[in-house]
Amino acid sequence: MATFKLVISDPKSGIAKQVEITGAETEKLIGKRIGDQIPAKELNINLNELFGKEFPEDVKLEIRGGTDKDGFPMRPDIHGPRRVRVLLSKGPGFRPKEKGERRKKTVRGNTISPEIVQVNVKLVY
């Protein structure tokens, strides 16, 4: 059974909280992609208690990214749950030191699998 660290960010206040989920809640995340939205009720997360303020009941969590067990970041433009080496010039997983620099980097695809350890989500009201 997989265990995920869920980093929940509130874009209105700029606050981020970390929650660990296990069991049936993790099965609801496996197979989802970056950009998908999940109702917070499905994951049994009490956002009002976690953030200390009131949220509407229909609040959703939008998947924004994550990292796998070895620290490789997820990229929205690589499809599937696989790990690949790609030539990057910008974006998640690469910070160029010079203008126009490109380099091969190992990154993870955009689909959540049991190898993912951390999932970054943001609140969508």
From Swiss-Prot:
GO terms for cellular component: ribonucleoprotein complex; ribosome. Keywords: Ribonucleoprotein, Ribosomal protein. GO terms for molecular function: structural constituent of ribosome. SMART domains: Ribosomal_S6e. Residues 90-109 are annotated as: Disordered. The keyword Plastid does not apply. It comes from the Archaea. It holds the Pfam family Ribosomal_S6e. The keyword Ribosomal protein applies. GO terms for biological process: translation. PANTHER family: 40S RIBOSOMAL PROTEIN S6. Part of the 30S ribosomal subunit. Belongs to the eukaryotic ribosomal protein eS6 family. This is Small ribosomal subunit protein eS6. The lineage of its organism: Archaea, Methanobacteriati, Methanobacteriota, Thermococci, Thermococcales. The gene is rps6e.
